[in-house]
UniProtKB/Swiss-Prot annotation:
Its main location: cytoplasm. It comes from Corynebacterium diphtheriae (strain ATCC 700971 / NCTC 13129 / Biotype gravis). The lineage of its organism: Bacteria, Bacillati, Actinomycetota, Actinomycetes, Mycobacteriales. The gene is tsf. The keyword Nucleotide-binding does not apply. This is Elongation factor Ts. Signal peptide: none annotated. CDD domains: UBA_EF-Ts. InterPro entries: EF-Ts_dimer_sf, Transl_elong_EFTs/EF1B, Transl_elong_EFTs/EF1B_dimer, Transl_elong_Ts_CS, UBA-like_sf. Belongs to the EF-Ts family. HAMAP family: EF_Ts. SUPFAM superfamilies: Elongation factor Ts (EF-Ts), dimerisation domain, UBA-like. Keywords: Cytoplasm, Elongation factor, Protein biosynthesis. Residues 76-79 are annotated as: Involved in Mg(2+) ion dislocation from EF-Tu.
Length: 275
């Protein structure tokens, strides 16, 4: 008897974009282990695996106060662009900033006009008639901060928010840091430097790169070098300072920052409905 359901096959298709038969084979091969099935399909060349897994039907907005950013969710974009909801979200961001909230629990406990943010959002939810959620919060420490909020359309509130912490002086430094924030919004860097990538993530990527290389039939002696090359490509995709600059594709983000006298010390990126 199969250790998976039709719902598992459907979800795997949505996440990987692979065909039904491939999804069934992957689940059979992994004895129903969903995460391993995703890896199997990725090795076999499924496109956008991992990126689609982050998607969610959730609506809402991103709000920033000082060096704190919050995500608050609604069920529909109709509510997300409601003036009362947007005003409430900014008050929540202010309250979260006051306590330097970094967890959903700290966000929920933040004081909002004498009541917790958790109680306040329940009241607003009852009034609006739609489920609302305090999703997450982060406070980014740093000498200076650049903030970028992106709206998907003019009539909707920000759906992407980025905080970039940096050191540097003058208008050129400010402009460079802002460009870095826009880069994070667009290219979705996951780490600042390759040293920030967890060891388990590196090992997983190395393993996948090796399996792909072997399946391509490359000579055994060439495999280590090819794997390292693919790992370097991975770093250039996910590490901010190693990405090609959107402002000048001939330079890395680090080179652009160095020229402006900027040192990036951290960043955070939120997108509504994503992990």
């Amino acid at each position: 008897m199969a250790n998976y359901t039709a719902a598992d096959v459907k979800k795997l298709r949505e996440i990987t974009g692979s065909g039904m038969l491939d999804c069934k084979k992957a689940l059979e091969e992994t004895n129903g282990d969903f995460d391993k099935a995703v890896e199997v399909l990725r090795i076999k060349g499924a496109k956008d695996v991992g990126k689609r897994a982050e998607r969610n039907a959730t609506e809402g907005l991103i709000a920033v106060s000082g060096n704190t950013m919050v995500e608050i969710n609604s069920e529909t974009d109709f509510v997300a662009k409601n003036a009362e909801f947007k005003e409430f979200a900014q008050k929540v961001a202010d309250a979260a900033a006051a306590v330097k909230a970094n967890t959903p629990e700290e966000l929920a406990a933040a004081d909002l006009d004498g009541k917790t943010a958790a109680d306040a959002i329940q009241e607003l939810s009852a009034k609006i008639g739609e489920k609302l959620e305090l999703r997450r919060a982060i406070t980014l420490e740093g000498e200076k901060l650049s903030v970028y909020l992106h709206q998907r359309s003019a009539d909707l509130p920000p759906a992407v928010g980025v905080l970039v912490a940096y050191t540097g002086e003058g208008e050129a430094a400010q402009a460079a840091a802002h460009a870095a924030a826009m880069q994070v919004a667009a290219l979705k860097a996951q780490y600042l430097t390759r040293e920030d990538v967890p060891a388990e993530v590196i090992e997983k990527e190395r393993s996948i790169a090796e399996q792909i290389t072997r399946e391509e039939g490359k000579p055994e002696k060439a495999i280590p070098k090819i794997v390292e090359g693919r790992l370097n490509g991975f770093y250039k995709d996910v590490c901010l300072v190693e990405q090609a600059s959107v402002a000048d594709s001939k330079k890395t983000v680090k080179q652009v920052m160095d020229e402006a006298g900027v040192t990036l010390t951290g960043f955070a990126r939120y997108e509504v409905g994503q992990h």
